[in-house]
A protein has these predicted regions:
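Glycine/charged-rich beta-loop-alpha catalytic/anionic-binding loops adjacent to active sites
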Residues: 179-192, 276-280, 400, 432-436
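An extended, acidic, His-containing surface patch that forms the Zn2+-binding/catalytic region
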Residues: 371-471
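A short beta-alpha structural unit
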Residues: 77-81, 318-326, 337-342, 367-387, ...
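Acidic/histidine-rich catalytic neighborhood of metal-dependent amide-processing enzymes
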Residues: 177-264, 309-323, 327, 334-341, ...
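Metal-dependent peptidase/peptidase-like ectodomains
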Residues: 238, 242-295, 343-398
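Acidic/His- and Gly-rich active-site-bordering loop/insert found
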Residues: 46-185
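Short terminal hydrophobic/aromatic SLiMs and anchors at protein ends
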Residues: 5-14, 40-41
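His/Asp/Glu-rich mid-to-C-terminal helical/loop segments that flank catalytic regions of hydrolases
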Residues: 45-46, 52, 291-310, 344-356, ...
Length: 471
């Protein structure tokens, strides 16, 4: 069953109107807001289908324009939210969902938005479930002053943006598929990221709940929502209000391509390797026994297997990733992350890193200290203990006519940490692509499909809960 509609965008009427008005007003360019306004007008007057699609696009464009970049430096110090802009966005989001009709809406002191969509009449005793997405964007690529560009009825032509950024179907298989369907896609102007990670997820959750509020015929149980800060820093679940959450299972909406259903992820550790050397006057270095910590650190970096880096691995392969290095002759510090899908593989990776560090230090007569910090665990084991959580989701994909792609998450989500805390939480696709980059784009039809899945999921869980109640 399809609750939303993703037509072959756009209608001939839209294209005609768009071309006529752009000719009449040459100052209006594709980078500005005109295409979006024209899109809304045409969908209102030329389409007989439900306009959740328009509402969804509207909301997404609004959200990505808000700067919500998080700060790893602050988050690592325990500051949450790590930036005030996230808290400001959270407060606005809370007001929006309150107006839609959600109840118990609140923003915690740490910037989490919590709310509940009350159950349909007669479904109050259906077990609740929780939907989650995160409000922040990464700091590696700026998310300030995002200027989204809407490309209606994308035909596969190369898209040239600013700063030398271009999108080409020859280099992007998912983009090629979008072109085959004449999909509407949303990109940046090339100067920033887009923020589909995870404002696509935010938009889809809010739009789906709004749809349920206005369509009383679709029955559902109570649905909780959590919108979290600082997911991109790895601290998204540090202060999640578990005392408020009544759900025994949940779903993050933070994936990528349509159909992706993610129920396993990396085991993740951070590592800090500190080499201690000895400084002397360089003119007396041999006599005084200089020990250069930078040289030991350099040898350590060369010891890491080239075939086990992020850029040389995919699928179920783990890796070592160097994130930063700073140092002097006396002290050099290397910060890394380790990723592996199995516990055995992670344990072996930890031992391997220790060996590389110790042997590199010994080669230069330096001392070394290696510290590891667990970040999150693979959620596969816990989800296998609760198979109905994924089964409900698979049924929702089928009900929404979405093919299922079981893919491992080469990273983590708030759901992986929440699963570790006792609430099994698989991940749902959003229709966003090329995250954390100026090449990021989103597919409107795939975003609509995510809404279909969420609405179907609510129906399925309600039906199962209602059936069990009658027994």
């Amino acid at each position: 069953m399809r609750h939303t509609y993703s037509p072959p965008l756009y209608h001939k009427q839209f294209l005609s109107l768009f071309q006529t008005l752009q000719t009449a007003v040459p100052a209006i360019t594709a980078i500005e807001v005109f295409p979006f306004i024209a899109y809304s007008i045409c969908m209102k007057y030329f389409s007989n289908e439900p306009d959740l699609q328009t509402t969804l696009l509207n909301r997404f464009v609004k959200y990505v324009k808000v700067w919500t970049e998080s700060s790893s430096e602050n988050a690592d110090k325990g500051i949450q939210p790590s930036t005030e802009r996230q808290l400001s966005f959270a407060k606005n989001l809370a007001e929006e969902i309150k107006e839609i009709g959600l109840k118990e809406v609140q923003v915690t002191e740490f910037g989490y938005v919590y709310a509940v969509l009350p159950a349909s009449k007669g479904f109050e005793n259906v077990p609740p479930f929780c939907l989650l997405s995160h409000m922040d964007t990464v700091e590696e690529v700026t998310g300030k002053d995002v200027k989204p560009i809407i490309h209606p009825s994308y035909d596969g032509a190369k898209i040239d943006l600013q700063c030398g950024v271009s999108l080409d179907i020859k280099e992007d298989e998912c983009l090629a598929k979008a072109a085959q369907q004449n999909d509407t896609i949303i990109t940046t102007d090339g100067t920033t990221l887009l923020g589909a990670d995870d404002k696509a997820g935010l938009s889809e959750i809010v739009s789906s709940l709004e749809f349920l509020v206005s369509h009383k015929g679709i029955k559902h149980g109570p649905i909780e929502v959590i919108f979290s800060p600082d997911e991109e820093t790895g601290h998204g679940m540090d202060r999640v209000p578990l005392n408020l959450i009544k759900s025994k299972f949940a779903y993050t909406v933070d994936g990528g391509h349509i159909g992706e259903l993610e129920s396993e992820c990396f085991n993740a550790y951070g590592a800090t390797v500190t080499f201690i050397g000895k400084s002397t006057h360089t003119g007396d270095a041999r006599k005084k026994g200089m020990v250069n910590a930078i040289c030991a650190a350099s040898l350590f970096l060369q010891s890491l297997p080239p075939a086990e880096r992020p850029e040389t691995t995919d699928g179920y392969q783990g890796f070592f990733a160097v994130l930063g290095i700073q140092g002097s002759v006396e002290k050099a510090i290397v910060n890394l992350i380790l990723r592996d899908f199995s516990e055995e593989g992670m344990n072996a990776r930890i031992e391997k890193l220790k060996h590389f560090a110790i042997s590199s230090a010994e080669s230069y007569g330096a001392r070394v200290d290696v510290e590891f910090k667990a970040q999150y665990k693979n959620m596969k084991g816990e989800l296998e203990k609760n198979p109905e959580v994924v089964q409900n989701l698979e049924n929702a994909y089928k009900e929404a006519d979405v093919g299922i792609l079981h893919t491992p998450i080469r990273g983590g989500t708030d759901g992986s940490r929440l699963t570790e805390l006792g609430i099994p939480t698989p991940n749902i696709f959003t229709g966003g692509h090329n995250f954390h980059s100026r090449y990021e784009w989103a597919s409107l039809s795939q975003m609509c499909a995510a809404c279909d899945v969420l609405i179907s999921l609510a129906e399925i869980i309600a039906a199962n809960g209602h059936k069990n109640k009658k027994k």
